[in-house]
Amino acid sequence: MSSRRKRAPPVRVDEEKRQQLHWNMHEDRRNEPIIISDDDEQPCPGSDTSSAHYIILSDSLKEEVAHRDKKRCSKVVSFSKPIEKEETVGIFSPLSVKLNIVISPYHFDNSWKAFLGELTLQLLPAQSLIENFSERSITLMSSESSNQFLIYVHSKGEDVEKQKKEPMSICDKGILVESSFSGEMLEDLGWLQKKRRIKLYQKPEGNHIIKVGIYLLEAGLAKLDFLSDANSRMKKFNQLMKKVMEKLHNSIIPDVLEEDEDDPESEPEGQDIDELYHFVKQTHQQETQSIQVDVQHPALIPVLRPYQREAVNWMLQQECFRSSPATESALHFLWREIVTSEGLKLYYNPYTGCIIREYPNSGPQLLGGILADEMGLGKTVEVLALILTHTRQDVKQDALTLPEGKVVNYFIPSHYFGGKLKKTEIQNIEFEPKEKVQCPPTRVMILTAVKEMNGKKGVSILSIYKYVSSIYRYDVQRNRSLLKRMLKCLIFEGLVKQIKGHGFSGTFTLGKNYKEEDICDKTKKQAVGSPRKIQKETRKSGNKDTDSEYLPSDTSDDDDDPYYYYYKSRRNRSKLRKKLVPSTKKGKSQPFINPDSQGHCPATSDSGITDVAMSKSTCISEFNQEHETEDCAESLNHADSDVPPSNTMSPFNTSDYRFECICGELDQIDRKPRVQCLKCHLWQHAKCVNYDEKNLKIKPFYCPHCLVAMEPVSTRATLIISPSSICHQWVDEINRHVRSSSLRVLVYQGVKKDGFLQPHFLAEQDIVIITYDVLRSELNYVDIPHSNSEDGRRLRNQKRYMAIPSPLVAVEWWRICLDEAQMVECPTVKAAEMAQRLSGINRWCISGTPVQRGLEDLFGLVVFLGIEPYCVKHWWVRLLYRPYCKKNPQHLYSFIAKILWRSAKKDVIDQIQIPPQTEEIHWLHFSPVERHFYHRQHEVCCQDVVVKLRKISDWALKLSSLDRRTVTSILYPLLRLRQACCHPQAVRGEFLPLQKSTMTMEELLTSLQKKCGTECEEAHRQLVCALNGLAGIHIIKGEYALAAELYREVLRSSEEHKGKLKTDSLQRLHATHNLMELLIARHPGIPPTLRDGRLEEEAKQLREHYMSKCNTEVAEAQQALYPVQQTIHELQRKIHSNSPWWLNVIHRAIEFTIDEELVQRVRNEITSNYKQQTGKLSMSEKFRDCRGLQFLLTTQMEELNKCQKLVREAVKNLEGPPSRNVIESATVCHLRPARLPLNCCVFCKADELFTEYESKLFSNTVKGQTAIFEEMIEDEEGLVDDRAPTTTRGLWAISETERSMKAILSFAKSHRFDVEFVDEGSTSMDLFEAWKKEYKLLHEYWMALRNRVSAVDELAMATERLRVRDPREPKPNPPVLHIIEPHEVEQNRIKLLNDKAVATSQLQKKLGQLLYLTNLEKSQDKTSGGVNPEPCPICARQLGKQWAVLTCGHCFCNECISIIIEQYSVGSHRSSIKCAICRQTTSHKEISYVFTSEKANQEEDIPVKGSHSTKVEAVVRTLMKIQLRDPGAKALVFSTWQDVLDIISKALTDNNMEFAQISRVKTFQENLSAFKRDPQINILLLPLHTGSNGLTIIEATHVLLVEPILNPAHELQAIGRVHRIGQTKPTIVHRFLIKATIEERMQAMLKTAERSHTNSSAKHSEASVLTVADLADLFTKETEELE
């Protein structure tokens, strides 16, 4: 009973006390003003806009009401006088803002304003106006009456708005008036005036009426990005202006439902697409076409049918054929014209409330539309007829022709001969031997190298060497000392500075004294000197310097290097010149000098420079300068006579020379012709930009970026965009239907393959065909800024290569056609975005199924067509789709009828004369093995789908309304079941990948038996675990006899299932050991058995058997380690440990002064091709010279040998039988730690030694065990029972020490050191490999020893049973499983009893399935002749050739089964029977009937080789029957999954049937052509998603659908491949369905959906067809049938 005292009953409090207990939150703020935020977007929250509730202001606050704080933009409101008592009990009365509108007298000023309308203020009879009223400002305020207002007249000339302290200087008593506007509307006007969007002016008419003019100010005009601009949420200003305009001009939106925020758009229950198509057809029939043209073009081979002529005529009408588009600028659909009383024209949008001054032009007339003729009616021919009939006449040639007075600069380096010289002519030319080879001076080369290769860390000396060697072909090896001396001089002069390191091992950058002119100025000073002085300096330099400054002569490189000039006699040069005159006339030029990036020319130290007056080319010579000048001038004069000067001049000497090509090559002298952009003057390779030399005087050249930025080039070409699968089909159709040479056709493959095609080249074509894949990829090449433009990236140096933009946007296409246009119906996909960016006159969407999920899909096509305003999503939804959803389809239907043409097969069937199409359904039955597999999958999938569907509350939702991830998740079980109906191996994740081999049914049966056996062992393990646990509970409770009986039950169960199952040996050991302990204790009540004496021996055998595996592993690991250790001893004997070979090599390198090369080689080997570990200092950064390398290697080798010795000793100490101390320490340390491993036992210590040794021997990328557990502690991950690492934690990469040794050995070999050094080094490398092998085997040996100790601990744990914690024993933390609290005993007993019941039931079920599969295997045994000798358990007769198998595995003859079914069926619908042996329930549909006799039906007796699934075998048999009945007939096989097609292809190969398969894009066209043309290939395997769109395969007459297709439009597309115009034979559709599976349910559901949608041709996907309830129904009904 509760200890609380009884309380008194509640008593009603009197009124006075209630008043005392009441608290008013506004009491303390009675006279305090409330600051209400004045947001420009939203009205004041909580305010009531009706005029009936205004707050009367107190006199002290009247002046503050109208005050507007410009900084805070707030409204000041106060509460009225104290609230009455009865009001305090109720809800606080609503607030409202005081009406306060200032109306000024009208005066003329220069500001723009437009008169919108006026409102009338009528004075009451007793009121009158004062004198000069029209010259005064008035304030309109609300009164106590909701229908009347007060006006206050201000002093004359008083500016009420500009006064801040006293804005309402009331000069007289308020005048009562009535307004033509409501109080709410007046409030809106006040808000608009306060925001300075409108202005109110008063104009009295008589003594009793005041007219108030509403004027729109310039700030009230809308600023729109485009005319159809519509924000998803209207601003407050627009909302109020809309109300005002409706009041003034009655501008209510015509015939359109207003937006209802509370009622969002909802998809209609059923969208009848046929109703839309019927409306379109009726509309076109009622129209009279203004154009009737004979569209049968002479170049068109096929004769157009009447419906095709009508379609082409309609398309011509849409393109305004023989009539120009309307030139009058029509008013935009969304806007209305308003003319003010002053004659000013404004334009108002009644949908958004926006007003503008500019005329809203509706834009160009729509040219194009949607051609939606049904599949197979010849849309391709109709488009070709349109292209041939209507060509563009007004092509502007300005962009395609070269402007007057301009010449394209086209330059070819001189070594490139336009025409080849004959061999005899070359022999006649006598060349003198080269006298001298020149190159830039060393200081120029070094400064150029430092400048060009400068980075964040500077330039190393090696980088300078590489640059000088590769660019100038300078002999660095020979002249290294000269380069070093020059570098020291440059550092001393301040032109170069060292930023890192010491000596030449550091890095360098340009110094503070360096200037851009240094390179050329220095060389010019040297070049200006007289030849005599130069020769003198050359002689002084000596032979060594001369050899270092000049490269060795090599005739093979002479012509390739522009820096070396060879000087010949005038006679020989003149002979060569005569041969080269023709090529010079074509625009070729003389040798030139390669400028640097700044346009300067590198000069030579021993040459004079002479500028030729007639050109900018430079002729360089060491002697005879005058003669050379004459030769150069003479040569250029010849060129000038025929070619414009810009073509012959070398561009490299000009200051504005820039070269940047799309090929990415650097600006080096090559033999490729170059061309210059007329706009940005950029030079590029002519071939790279597809500019032909023959167009020099005809076509202008602009670089790709300039072309894209210019106005598009107008052309008469038609761009056709098609799927990849039918791209080549377009070419075939054009070749077949159009006479040769009538059309020029180009298949464009994108800038990746074709490069940048010149727009004038595209403009010369009649048809350009691209694929959607190319179109999608071209989007990446549209908005690429010019690298040197303002939008491009600003780089320190010029970019190496130019990114290529897409040329498609540089052309104004005459016509753009989207074939299979449903691919762009989603306007967010890349292909749709690119299609919208293309510039075109006529736009066409071509699709037999323009509607996929619903009518909202048409929006993507409307966006491509660019039809305003419906190409904006807001207007599409508001004006068309929302009314359609609300049962008002007229607007949408009328709009679509204007842009869409549709001809259906049923309407023109008499014109096309296509033979009929029939359908044949093949109902199949699973084999027993497949049925068992399917039932397993169904059980798992049902559980999965129930769990997922529970998360969805509303099952009436369509799957299309859910997000994609959820839909994929809940459809996945359905997908698995559908795949299981085709082939077990098609189910993902069930078996090995198909690449290995296709599984036969025998292999499937074997796999199922193994799985079932594993499941039986798992169920038996759970049962034994429960029995052992219950025995422990009985021992705790003192019930020893029951415990012994349970242990004996475990041993009996183990013996009973000995032949079928494998019992866990540790569980048997647990039962044997504890039973033996009970018997030794001699507890009363335990009966003896004959087996009691053998328990000790059995326990010993179990222990020995368990330990034998571990002992064997230890012995094998030790045996594998021994030969490797022997090899190591042999290698070590060959190496001199006192004087290592690498030490001798280092000493020799120092002795020969090649130590720097050795150091650099070692560093390169360490740093190259290996990723450095982050946060770790590399070995290459620890030494600078050979002395440091020597010390580092010595230290590391000593540490390596030390770690190696420690690891070997640690492993050696672990050998032998483990002692009790070792086992106990390992148990406490890591086998059974309290929380985290302690790493204190000998095994863990050895593991740390292994980690250390591994970091020395291999690349240090491993992580030790301690570090791993430290991270776990930091992350607070808790227990880590199974997280102890067992092997290495990183990659076994080559260590830096070994790589250094390899580099030293390579250095010794290259410099041919002593052979004994090299041999010893090779032996040392072999020793490293042996050490690594030893490490791996040593670690495996350590693991085997560790596992042996772990096995000993496992045996000790296996004998422990449940026990109660002793009161004196501390509570374990974390809890230990076998130690329980006293109060948990009964709880654990109940849990174990439940586990026992579940495990017993599961074991019985799985054993039945295993027996069932075993009997199935017997039925497939052909050695017995198909006769089962076993007797029937009921009638004892031989089963023979026909019997029945239940799911429990027991077999009965057919007669006994029929009696049991008729007389002894059980269940709610009497649909199940119980086995006569085990009493397990089996559904009637789950009974398998085995027939081993030959089939009597000869028609089905077509042998199919191989063991395949039921469906695959049926498909192959059907294909074989087709060939038997109609040899040569071709068939298409469609499947949703590529894996299923691969399985079918394997079956066809086994049966020697020729076929073609389309699986990859690359072989698509090749395989398709082979199927069409090769009479031996009569089968084509097609995936549904790629092979069902747009293909024309009328060669085939049979279509095989392997599985039911949830998307009816995909099915229509697949069938439409053969049933189309041009087909001359009857076609047959074959469907393959499995009885009593998900396929039967799906077929029934799809038929019902088809009838309910009135055969709608809408394209429904799985998500749009199914609801959540439908999906649940698919599984639940089938489950009921199975049960």
UniProtKB/Swiss-Prot annotation:
Catalysis: reaction(s): S-ubiquitinyl-[E2 ubiquitin-conjugating enzyme]-L-cysteine + [acceptor protein]-L-lysine = [E2 ubiquitin-conjugating enzyme]-L-cysteine + N(6)-ubiquitinyl-[acceptor protein]-L-lysine
The protein's name in its UniProt record: E3 ubiquitin-protein ligase SHPRH
Keyword Ligase applies: no
Domain statement: The RING finger mediates E3 ubiquitin ligase activity.
Domain H15: 438-512
Tissue: Broadly expressed.
Domain Helicase C-terminal: 1514-1672
Family as reported in the entry's similarity comment: Belongs to the SNF2/RAD54 helicase family.
Motif, DEAQ box: chain positions: 819-822
Zinc finger extent (PHD-type): 658-709
Residues annotated as transmembrane: none
Swiss-Prot/TrEMBL keywords: ATP-binding, DNA damage, DNA repair, Helicase, Hydrolase, Metal-binding, Nucleotide-binding, Phosphoprotein, Transferase, Ubl conjugation pathway, Zinc, Zinc-finger
Annotated zinc fingers (RING-type), start-end: 1432-1479
Basic and acidic residues: bias regions: 12-32, 534-547
